[in-house]
């Protein structure tokens, strides 16, 4: 029996699956979470068994990717047997802003700590406020209520990205303070080779904002699978709980 299993499952893969860290790491990856070096044990586990686990996940038509910045995540193919991870247009835009902030001088000045309010303010500063408001309400008049709704959607987007391992809460859960992980570079692949990374990311934000207000407002129909998102990132444009 054991000999037959060894023929079917390579020894190192069997060791990976038997590792006590595997169930939690597997669950996180399948939910769309990104695992970076800040997760010491989980990251070391993935680094040690990267090739074996990639072979394991390919049976489900997904790939275990290690990005140039070091973090791990699963990228599904069109025929994936694992539920696809998706993001709305607005969540992708907020992700681009987070990447922009990660590259900013303020990150060092503020010891890497940002707030949801800063994300909201930066989004309004970099993108067209009127288009963003119309994404919340097509008949937006720029009222305080419309701005409040937009702020709520931005906060929800930040929380979604937190669950995906893009940011990490600082202090109390509801403090609104967080640090930004390198995994936000999923939203800025183009900046890896740009002469000026921050300017390149600014272009990505403006390109994303340049999408029609209709595409931003139709969040339910605007979601894309993770593989499509990766293609858009590579082209210079831009998961499930």
Swiss-Prot record:
Keyword terms of this UniProt record: Cell cycle, Cell division, Chromosome partition, Cytoplasm, DNA condensation
One Pfam family this sequence matches: MukE
Entry GO CC: cytoplasm; nucleoid
InterPro entries documented for this protein: MukE_C (IPR042037), MukE_N (IPR042038), Scp_MukE (IPR007385)
Record field: transmembrane: none
Top-level taxon: Bacteria
GO biological process assignments: cell division; chromosome condensation; chromosome segregation; DNA replication
Stretch list, region Disordered: 207-241
Subcellular localization(s) per the UniProt record: Cytoplasm, Nucleoid
Composition skew (Acidic residues), residue ranges: 227-241
Family in the record: Belongs to the MukE family.
Subunit organization: Interacts, and probably forms a ternary complex, with MukF and MukB. The complex formation is stimulated by calcium or magnesium.
Function noted in UniProt: Involved in chromosome condensation, segregation and cell cycle progression. May participate in facilitating chromosome segregation by condensation DNA from both sides of a centrally located replisome during cell division. Probably acts via its interaction with MukB and MukF.
Name of this protein: Chromosome partition protein MukE
Source organism of the structure: Mannheimia succiniciproducens (strain KCTC 0769BP / MBEL55E)
């Amino acid at each position: 029996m054991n000999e037959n299993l060894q023929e079917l499952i390579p020894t190192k893969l069997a060791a990976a699956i038997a590792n006590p860290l595997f169930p939690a790491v597997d669950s996180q990856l399948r939910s769309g979470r990104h695992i970076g070096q800040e997760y010491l044990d989980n990251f070391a586990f993935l680094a040690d068994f990267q090739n074996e686990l990639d072979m394991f996940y390919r049976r489900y038509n997904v790939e275990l990717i290690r990005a140039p910045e070091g973090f791990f995540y699963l990228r599904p193919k069109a025929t994936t047997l694992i539920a696809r991870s998706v993001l709305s247009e607005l969540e992708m835009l907020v992700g681009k802003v987070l990447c922009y902030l990660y590259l900013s001088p303020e990150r060092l000045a503020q010891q890497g700590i940002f707030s949801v309010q800063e994300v909201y303010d930066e989004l309004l500063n970099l993108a067209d406020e009127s288009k963003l408001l119309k994404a919340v309400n097509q008949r937006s008049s720029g009222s305080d209520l419309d701005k409040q709704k937009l702020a709520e959607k931005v906060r929800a987007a930040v929380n979604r990205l937190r669950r995906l391992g893009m940011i990490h809460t600082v202090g109390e859960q509801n403090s609104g303070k967080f640090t930004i992980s390198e995994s936000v570079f999923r939203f800025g692949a183009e900046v890896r080779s740009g002469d000026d990374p921050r300017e390149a990311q600014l272009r990505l934000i403006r390109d994303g904002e340049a999408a029609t207000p209709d595409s931003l407002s139709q969040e339910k129909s605007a979601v894309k699978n993770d593989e499509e998102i990766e293609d858009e990132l590579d082209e210079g444009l831009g998961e499930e709980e």
